[in-house]
């Protein structure tokens, strides 16, 4: 992992000497976790050893994602926990709880991306919380960055750079626009793998449980609280929606929904319109 990627920090860069020292300590102290907690209501509060839990990863899921098993494999780590929050009454997502790695928990919540994320945050034991969508890929460098950041214990929040995977040439420019916009405005999108120190979320009453636009809402609340980090580290996600629904049509609709939300449209109203289209089933 490159340790010079802590860039674009509001309030000044994190001390690079601390990052280097702590990354060595993390590597030296890593070991296997034998905890397997698959449950619906109450999380396990203790670990089989005395080492502190560094990072909690929350993954909301609703339906099958071809990449889901690969994502869980990439997140298997003794120094982080993964909380999969499946929408109640939804179809299985492709992995049976008894086959999960030891650091994965499987819980259920009413179908609502914000609500599922909020439920995952409540079950999380780590002080740094990372929200990933089920179709995210290429997360190894981002995970290493957050493990080091978590050990510093600083009240920060932020996101990573997004890369959109697909065949349409415009996906590169959409991703660049998303990254630039969020870097300048601190209004982020969930596809960018947003992360939060628990203390910062607590200042704004926790993660918003609304059904849509939860990423915009939490960004608005967190602006000016803690330090905003936009490391130049990419994670990838599918550009399927742009290719499936039409590139320019999708760009226009996404901007329109965001504008309507900023102008006062409710998240419930926008959710009903968005998911009223049968092709938009994946959370």
Task: Describe the function of each predicted region.
Residues 141-169:
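Conserved donor NDP-sugar-binding/catalytic core segment of glycosyltransferases
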């Amino acid at each position: 992992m490159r340790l010079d990627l802590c860039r674009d920090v509001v309030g000044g860069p994190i001390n690079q000497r601390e990052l280097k020292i702590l990354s060595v300590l993390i590597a030296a102290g890593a070991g296997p976790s034998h905890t397997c907690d698959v449950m619906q209501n109450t999380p396990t509060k203790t670990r089989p050893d005395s080492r502190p839990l560094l990072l909690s990863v929350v993954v909301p899921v609703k339906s099958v994602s071809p990449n889901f098993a690969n994502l869980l494999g990439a997140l298997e780590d003794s120094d982080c926990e993964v909380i999969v929050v499946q929408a109640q009454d939804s179809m299985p997502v492709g992995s049976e709880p008894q086959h999960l790695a030891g650091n994965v928990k499987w819980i259920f919540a009413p179908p609502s991306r914000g609500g599922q994320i909020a439920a995952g945050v409540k079950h999380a034991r780590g002080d740094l919380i990372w929200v990933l969508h089920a179709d995210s890929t290429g997360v190894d460098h981002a995970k290493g960055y957050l493990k080091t950041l978590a050990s510093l214990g600083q009240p920060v929040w932020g996101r990573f750079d997004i890369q959109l995977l697909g065949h349409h040439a415009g996906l590169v420019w959409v991703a660049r626009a998303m990254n630039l916009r969020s870097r300048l405005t601190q209004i982020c999108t969930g596809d960018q793998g947003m992360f939060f120190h628990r203390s910062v979320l607590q200042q704004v009453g926790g993660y918003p449980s609304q059904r849509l636009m939860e990423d915009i809402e939490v960004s608005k609340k967190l602006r000016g609280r803690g330090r905003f980090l936009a490391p130049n580290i990419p994670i990838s996600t599918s550009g399927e929606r742009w290719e499936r629904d039409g590139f320019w049509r999708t760009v226009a609709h996404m901007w329109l929904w965001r504008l309507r939300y900023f102008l006062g449209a409710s998240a419930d109203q926008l959710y009903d319109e968005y998911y009223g289209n049968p092709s938009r089933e994946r959370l």
